[in-house]
Amino acid sequence: IGSGPCTFISETAGTEMELGSFADYHLGTPKFGKLVLKVVSASNTITSVAAGEMDAFFQSPSMDDALAAKDLGMNVEEAANPTSVVVFLINNQNVPDKRIRQAMSYAIDKELLIEQNMRGNAVASATCIIPGSEYDKGIAWSRDVDKAKALLAEAGWDGRTLHMVVTAARESMAAVIQQNLADAGITIDVQTVELATMFSGLQDGTYDLGICGSNAMVYPLWMAGYYDYRNATYCQISDPKLAELQDTIAAEIDPAKKKELVNEYQDMLYDEMPLVILYHGYSFAVKSDRLQGFNAFEGGVNNEKSWN
C-alpha cells in the first residue's frame, strides 16, 4: 500500500505516520529508509529541530521563527525566488464592474502589507505570474489612490458597504486594507470566521471580499482554477474568456507561442482584475544538518520540476 514515492508502514491517528521508500518509484528510489511524519504544535517546530527531535517541518517558518533559528545557529535557507502568494478575493457577481475591482488594486497599499507581514521579504505583484520569472511580462503595479478614485467615479460607484471576511491570522491585513479602501471611497466591514466558513461564504455569495494564501509556482496556469467559470470559484467568475485562454495556453506546445499567449493572459488578468494579487513572498526553510538532498521549496501545488 502506498502513494507515489512512499509505502505505508503504520499510523497513530492524529499523531504520527511512518512511510517507507518505494523501490520501484518511476522517478527513482527515494534516498531514505523510513520517513516519519509527526503532528506537533506550530510553536514547537524550531525547538524540535534544534533538539534533534525532528529534521524538518512542512509549514514554512514565520519570519520571527526564521530569525530565531538563525540566532540559534541553525541551518536556515531562504528561497531564491518567491514561493508563496497572498490574494485579495473579490466576488465578481457582487462587484461586477471591473473598474471597481481595478480601483481596489490601485488603492491597496501592497508595500505596507509586505513590510508589516513579511518584513520586506516579498514583492508586490500585478498578476499571479511571479515577478521576475520566465513568464513574467513585466507589468508593474504601483499604488495610486487618485486613479482609484477616478475609476470609482467613472464607474458610478454607489457607495454601498462591502462585506469582507478573514481568518484570525489575517485580521491585521484586513485592517490595513479597510483603511486603504476607505481612502479611495470604498467602505467595507470586516468579519472574522473560520477558514471553511470564509471559502463557502465567498462561493455562495454571502461575502464580497476575502484574503487567502497559497504556494506559488512558475508554471503560468497554476492558479487556473481560480479564474475558471466552470468551477465554483471563490470569486464567482462567470465570464468564460479567461478559462478559454487558459485552455489555449495549456494546449500550445511551441514555447515561443506559449509565451505570447501567457503575455496576453497577463494583460487580460490585469485588465479584468477578477482578484487582486497582493504579493508574492519569499519563504524560509529550517532543517537539521544531517538532512541532505532535501529542497524545501519544491513542494508546491504541482510537480512542475518533473514536468519540465
Question: PLM features: residue spans?
Answer:
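Short helices/loops that flank or line small-molecule/ion binding pockets
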Residues: S43-D55, L67-D71, R99, A175-A184, ...
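Ligand/substrate-recognition segments at binding pockets and active sites
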Residues: A153-A216, S283
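Gly/Pro-rich hinge or "lid" segments in bacterial periplasmic/extracellular proteins
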Residues: I1-P30, K34, N44, V145-D146
